[in-house]
């Protein structure tokens, strides 16, 4: 089913984009939550009228995201963890731990913005991307050290 997005959806595209999605996804999620409208000729005309406003909104959001990316890029957080004799962590470092460490440094991000593929289970230094906007992903440095 073809739909026109009425808001930015990370997995699909930006506002105003016409995309093809599964019928059930459109009927059960996108359309009821007003995140998209059916791609009919009438809706295309309405979207064209709103496009200028949306493009200005996207430009403003992207500018704010790039400013935030400059603040975040290269931020180094150090997390202490209990380790075994083989330098394996008891437990792991999760997204919430990184979010809390960033908050202590004055950088407020949502958990969903931190793109950690899997929990960190070893000591060392890791580069973790943070998605602030579509295509804008600065990296932070997470250092895991043993607790004294």
Swiss-Prot record:
Gene Ontology molecular functions: rRNA binding; structural constituent of ribosome
UniProt KW Endoplasmic reticulum keyword: no
Keywords of the record: Ribonucleoprotein, Ribosomal protein, RNA-binding, rRNA-binding
GO process annotations (BP): translation
GO CC annotation terms, alphabetical: ribonucleoprotein complex; ribosome
PROSITE patterns in the record: RIBOSOMAL_L9
Pfam families: Ribosomal_L9_C, Ribosomal_L9_N
InterPro entries reported in the protein's UniProt record: Ribosomal_bL9, Ribosomal_bL9/RNase_H1_N, Ribosomal_bL9_bac/chp, Ribosomal_bL9_C, Ribosomal_bL9_C_sf, Ribosomal_bL9_N, Ribosomal_bL9_N_sf
Job description of the protein: Binds to the 23S rRNA.
Family statement: Belongs to the bacterial ribosomal protein bL9 family.
NCBIfam families per UniProt: L9 (TIGR00158)
Identification of the protein by name: Large ribosomal subunit protein bL9
UniProt source species: Desulfatibacillum aliphaticivorans
Record lineage: Bacteria, Pseudomonadati, Thermodesulfobacteriota, Desulfobacteria, Desulfobacterales
